[in-house]
From Swiss-Prot:
A zinc finger (B box-type) spans 102-143. It comes from Pan troglodytes. This is E3 ubiquitin-protein ligase TRIM39. Pathway: Protein modification; protein ubiquitination. GO terms for cellular component: cytoplasm; cytosol; mitochondrion; nucleus. Zn(2+) binds at residues 107, 110, 129, 135. Pfam families: PRY (PF13765), SPRY (PF00622), zf-B_box (PF00643), zf-C3HC4_4 (PF15227). InterPro entries: B30.2/SPRY (IPR001870), B30.2/SPRY_sf (IPR043136), Butyrophylin_SPRY (IPR003879), ConA-like_dom_sf (IPR013320), PRY (IPR006574), PRY/SPRY_TRIM39 (IPR035033), SPRY_dom (IPR003877), TRIM/RBCC (IPR050143). One of its GO terms (molecular function) is identical protein binding. E3 ubiquitin-protein ligase. May facilitate apoptosis by inhibiting APC/C-Cdh1-mediated poly-ubiquitination and subsequent proteasome-mediated degradation of the pro-apoptotic protein MOAP1. Regulates the G1/S transition of the cell cycle and DNA damage-induced G2 arrest by stabilizing CDKN1A/p21. Positively regulates CDKN1A/p21 stability by competing with DTL for CDKN1A/p21 binding, therefore disrupting DCX(DTL) E3 ubiquitin ligase complex-mediated CDKN1A/p21 ubiquitination and degradation. Belongs to the TRIM/RBCC family. It catalyses: S-ubiquitinyl-[E2 ubiquitin-conjugating enzyme]-L-cysteine + [acceptor protein]-L-lysine = [E2 ubiquitin-conjugating enzyme]-L-cysteine + N(6)-ubiquitinyl-[acceptor protein]-L-lysine.
Length: 518
């Protein structure tokens, strides 16, 4: 059977060689017997090298015969045969390949075709080698059979390679899409930032207009009081000047003349001690003059009256600005959410503080708690009493030196009773710490977070309409991670204090008011 295969292989090779030889003949010039160079075709249809047929007809002026069929043509007609020229080049290449294959497929020892394959020596051998002493006891099969066998083995090796190639191709395709996705995400975040600051500018402009209007009103009020006070002081000045002139005139009169018109000087500036000397000046009219002096002394206030002035000190809101612009601070304070813990949702191993601001894990399960639909019975966490369906909200959680915790939000419809994996796909958006130093955003798969400064307090900012949940390290004022999603349900702040490991991680999670907003 092996000999039959060898004969069939030899017949196939002979047929191929004959076809190649025929092609070489057709691509050869009948004059020079070499491959055609610049082949041209004459009237009878035969092809020759342009140089060969030109030399053949060199001394002829008419009746140009064909070197092959002797048919004559009346004109020296030479048409280039470019298609044949291309075939000649192909024939040359095939001849080179044939020569190489022939050299490689011949036994270097016996110069016979290498038509068999020796399994023991893993090499191709000729028929003479197969029956020689060297390979006589070896397993020898036709080369085509061995080729097919090894081709199947290589095919099996190729399958995992192709699978890996497809995987890498998919990965490459995915990576090539990421710049576009990144561009879209960046543009979305850019538009969000622009909207945020546009809104911030609008609110600041409104606050600025309110404050400027208030400042202008206060300015006008103070100016009005200044004008009124100036007019009043002008009137007082004129009265005092007139009185001073009259007093000076009276001082120049004799005592009798001065006392004669004393009733007209009730508004004059007469010292109180003057009353004690009246008895010596005019003893007869002493009693009457005492009454007049009382009237005069009542007008002494003209001398002692203090002149009032209008203060131009502005209100404290305008004279002392706080460290942050209070208008901006006022806007930001509106975002702070008053978050308290809901005992109806707390896992039985969690204990809440009296003010419902702290939660910690205890080893002993509380048995007197009713198993309500809202209570978590597998995942040891607790939710807030208030959820959010719109708007922007910010709260802070003190994590201290805990080694295990998670904070974030969950949607209203999450499973609370059975075993679960808290991921965005199941309705949980969280950042967590475990083993004391491993931080991650609980995406699919987890996104490791490389945090330089260990946070003692974590800030959480929810923008429901924008579909973002951002986490911040309050300790060093750095951004930790932002989830981007589409929120369609009520979202509840979530707190997971982590299980205790001996004395480690015993501290509670505590909701704290932001301390840098005042």
């Amino acid at each position: 059977m092996a000999e039959t295969s060898l004969l069939e292989a030899g017949a196939s090779a002979a047929s191929t060689a004959a076809a190649l030889e025929n092609l070489q003949v057709e691509a050869s010039c009948s004059v020079c017997l070499e491959y055609l160079k610049e082949p041209v075709i004459i009237e009878c249809g035969h092809n020759f090298c342009k140089a060969c047929i030109t030399r053949w007809w060199e001394d002829l002026e008419r009746d140009f015969p064909c070197p092959v069929c002797r048919k004559t043509s009346r004109y020296r007609s030479l048409r280039p045969n470019r298609q044949l020229g291309s075939m000649v080049e192909i024939a040359k290449q095939l001849q080179a390949v044939k020569r190489k294959i022939r050299d490689e497929s011949l036994c270097p020892q016996h110069h016979e075709a290498l038509s068999l394959f020796c399994y023991e020596d893993q090499e191709a051998v000729c028929l003479i080698c197969a029956i020689s002493h060297t390979h006589r006891a070896h397993t020898v099969v036709p080369l085509d059979d061995a080729t097919q066998e090894y081709k199947e083995k290589l095919q099996k090796c190729l399958e995992p390679l192709e699978q890996k190639l497809q995987e890498i191709t998919r990965c490459k395709s995915s990576e090539e899409k990421k710049p576009g996705e990144l561009k879209r995400l960046v543009e979305s975040r850019r538009q969000q930032i622009l909207r945020e600051f546009e809104e911030l500018h609008r609110r600041l402009d409104e606050e600025q207009q309110v404050l400027l209007s208030r400042l202008e009103e206060e300015e006008q009020d103070i100016l009005q009081r200044l004008r009124e006070n100036a007019a009043h002081l002008g009137d007082k000045r004129r009265d005092l000047a007139h009185l001073a002139a009259e007093v000076e005139g009276k001082c120049l009169q004799s005592g009798f003349e001065m006392l004669k018109d004393v009733k007209s000087t009730l508004e004059k500036n007469i010292p109180r001690k003057f009353g004690g000397s009246l008895s010596r000046i005019c003893p007869r009219d002493h009693k009457a003059l005492l009454g007049l002096v009382k009237e005069i002394n009542r007008c002494e206030k003209v001398k002692t009256m203090e002149v009032t002035s209008v203060s131009i000190e502005l209100e404290k809101n305008f004279s002392n600005f706080p460290r942050q612009y209070f208008a901006l601070r006022k806007i930001l304070k509106q975002l702070i959410a008053d978050v308290t813990l809901d005992p109806e949702t707390a896992h039985p191993n969690l204990v809440l503080s009296e003010d419902r601001k702290s939660v910690k894990f205890v080893e002993t399960r509380l048995r007197d708690l009713p198993d309500t639909p809202r209570r978590f019975t597998f995942y040891p966490c607790v939710l807030a009493t208030e959820g959010f369906t719109s708007g922007r909200h910010y709260w802070e959680v003190e994590v201290g030196d805990k080694t295990h915790w998670a904070v974030g939000v969950c949607r209203d419809s999450v499973s609370r009773k059975g075993e679960l994996t808290p991921l965005p796909e199941t309705g949980y958006w969280r950042v967590r710490l475990w083993n004391g130093d491993k931080y991650a955003a609980t995406t699919t798969p987890f996104t490791p977070l490389h945090i330089k400064v260990k946070p003692k307090r974590v800030g959480i900012f929810l923008d429901y309409e924008a579909g973002t949940l951002s986490f911040y390290n309050v300790t060093d004022r750095s951004h930790i991670y932002t989830f981007t999603d589409t929120f369609t349900e009520k979202l509840w702040p979530l707190f997971y204090p982590g299980i205790r490991a001996g004395r480690k991680n015993a501290a509670p999670l505590t909701i704290r008011p932001p301390t840098d907003w005042e």
